[in-house]
């Protein structure tokens, strides 16, 4: 088992090399610090306590500050245990590179709070008839309906009734890791995860232990745009390039074609100037000959 703590940034969409659109959740995964290590001999189970996202010391009590000092780190805002995770020592950093593209993970977070909600929204019940006696008075369209038989004398537990909706811990299983960006501490996960923007998340390897999927081949939008621009430039200078080439190869070929075109234009200009000068000399000679002929006459 392996896991890491992160923060939800939001959702976006990316494109594969085949042109398919993939909805992903962007999770910021800053390096986590191992703040405590649980062992079988001492605690009865194996786990690592991870801490992420710095917080001011004045918001913590002295015992809590001392707990973080044991791992030689600053107080952390989000601290959670990852069961059955081992291989790290106190104070070590856990980074996003523990996951790879194509792996399946379980993401746990606190769902969005919806407040007090009726049974239609809370339990997806059917709306009542809007005619034949329904839709007003003693029979509103969105009423709860039956909550038990007349002889029961009580309401059984588990009946779908109005109440508080959301703001509870939820886990979505088997989400695919699309991309791991170590440089920016970003994890892209396919699909949606529980909670609003900026909520804290626990990302763990899938408990169902399903096989990893083939990594999605993504397209680099900036690179694709630059290649299109280079293709247009190649048409202008008559260079032969293809999309399969690397950018620096395309630039070298286009640069060589541009130099060749400039050279040809320069030669054409010089030839034109030479031709014009020859015409001027010829005209001057004809003029002198004509003057001589006029004097001889």
UniProtKB/Swiss-Prot annotation:
Record region (Disordered): 124-143, 258-297
Highest taxon, organism lineage: Bacteria
Presence of keyword Ribonucleoprotein: yes
GO biological process terms held by the UniProt record: translation
A single MF term (Gene Ontology): rRNA binding
Any single Gene Ontology cellular-component annotation: cytosolic large ribosomal subunit
Alphabetized Pfam families for the sequence: Ribosomal_L3
Coiled coil: none
Stored InterPro entries: Ribosomal_uL3, Ribosomal_uL3_bac/org-type, Ribosomal_uL3_CS, Transl_B-barrel_sf
Keyword Iron: no
Keywords: Ribonucleoprotein, Ribosomal protein, RNA-binding, rRNA-binding
Record's function text: One of the primary rRNA binding proteins, it binds directly near the 3'-end of the 23S rRNA, where it nucleates assembly of the 50S subunit.
PANTHER family attached to this UniProt entry: 50S RIBOSOMAL PROTEIN L3, LARGE RIBOSOMAL SUBUNIT PROTEIN UL3C
Subunit field text: Part of the 50S ribosomal subunit. Forms a cluster with proteins L14 and L19.
Family label: Belongs to the universal ribosomal protein uL3 family.
Protein name stated in the entry: Large ribosomal subunit protein uL3
Provenance organism: Mycoplasma mobile (strain ATCC 43663 / 163K / NCTC 11711) (Mesomycoplasma mobile)
Species classification: Bacteria, Bacillati, Mycoplasmatota, Mycoplasmoidales, Metamycoplasmataceae
The gene coding this protein: rplC
């Amino acid at each position: 088992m392996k896991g890491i703590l992160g923060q939800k940034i939001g959702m976006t969409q990316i494109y594969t090399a085949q042109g398919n659109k993939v909805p992903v959740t962007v999770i910021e995964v800053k390096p986590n610090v191992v703040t405590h290590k649980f062992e079988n001999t001492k605690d009865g189970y194996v786990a690592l306590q991870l801490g992420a996202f710095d917080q001011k010391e004045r918001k913590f009590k002295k015992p809590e500050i001392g707990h973080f000092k044991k791992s030689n780190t600053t107080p952390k805002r989000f601290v959670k245990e990852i069961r059955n995770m081992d291989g790290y020592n106190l104070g070590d950093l856990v980074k996003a590179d523990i996951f790879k593209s194509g792996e399946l993970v379980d993401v746990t977070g606190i769902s969005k709070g919806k407040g007090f909600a009726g049974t239609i929204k809370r339990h997806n019940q059917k709306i009542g008839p809007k005619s034949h006696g329904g839709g007003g008075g003693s029979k509103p369209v969105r009423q709860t309906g039956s909550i038990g038989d007349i002889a029961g004398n009580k309401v059984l537990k588990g009946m779908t009734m109005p109440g508080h909706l959301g703001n509870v811990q939820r886990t979505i299983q088997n989400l695919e890791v699309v991309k791991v960006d170590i440089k920016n501490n970003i994890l892209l996960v396919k699909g949606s995860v529980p909670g609003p923007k900026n909520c804290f998340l626990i990302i763990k390897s899938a408990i169902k232990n399903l096989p990893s999927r083939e990594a999605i081949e993504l397209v680099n939008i900036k690179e694709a745009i630059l290649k299109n621009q280079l293709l247009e430039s190649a048409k202008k200078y008559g260079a032969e390039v293809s999309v399969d080439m690397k950018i620096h190869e395309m630039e070298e070929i286009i640069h060589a074609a541009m130099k060749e075109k400039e050279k040809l234009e320069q030669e054409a200009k010089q030839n034109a100037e030479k031709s014009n000068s020859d015409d001027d000399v010829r005209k001057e000679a004809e003029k002198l000959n004509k003057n001589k002929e006029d004097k001889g006459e």
